[in-house]
């Protein structure tokens, strides 16, 4: 048996800078990961199969077009018994499906002792799959295929992730964008020796998908506000196309206290404190 961890992907920034003739949007995003996520296990078997377990399993029925199965087929036609232990909410802006696909590629490559697919094949699985396969802090550009490591490591930090239980499909959010030619981040990103300096930089940047997502799901604004109101929260923003929002914290104690407070006030929300992985 082999196993791989599918960490939540967090867009600290997400600038939509253009649109290609084929309809794909051009992005400029500072991406990190949170130390919370799903797990993919792979065991030898004659045929390819998938079972989904975990607290979010009921929200993701097994289907033939599941990204985990699509990733497996990208590696070849061998058999395996796959189990996806689902902890991240579905269609929530933190790359759950893409992270699961990347984890499936890693687990199956080990099980079958085959190389990972070429970058073009990985990108065909989804725009976020390449960055999830990378699994570290990068600047993501193009349609998700241009990944540039950061010049300096990010400071130690904590995140609180909160999702109000609303599923936000990505296409309507992009369709509702007011404009698609927004400015990118600076060409040269500064170093961030402290969490406070990182938060100050992020405050000058954007998630261009946040306004249209809030128009479609006003609960996102309430989620962001709940995070921003917590003691120690340096910045609150939506990740990806929503509806999950993150709060950035310097201290683990403050992050855990914030997650507990939000969870108590909003028992129907999915809330998780997590170390930021850069």
From Swiss-Prot:
The active site is at residues 9, 128. ATP binds at residues 89-99. It is an enzyme of class 2 (transferase). Its EC number is 2.7.1.148. Pathway: Isoprenoid biosynthesis; isopentenyl diphosphate biosynthesis via DXP pathway; isopentenyl diphosphate from 1-deoxy-D-xylulose 5-phosphate: step 3/6. SUPFAM superfamilies: GHMP Kinase, C-terminal domain, Ribosomal protein S5 domain 2-like. It holds the Pfam family GHMP_kinases_C. HAMAP family: IspE (MF_00061). Belongs to the GHMP kinase family. IspE subfamily. Catalyzes the phosphorylation of the position 2 hydroxy group of 4-diphosphocytidyl-2C-methyl-D-erythritol. This is 4-diphosphocytidyl-2-C-methyl-D-erythritol kinase. It comes from Cereibacter sphaeroides (strain ATCC 17029 / ATH 2.4.9). The gene is ispE.
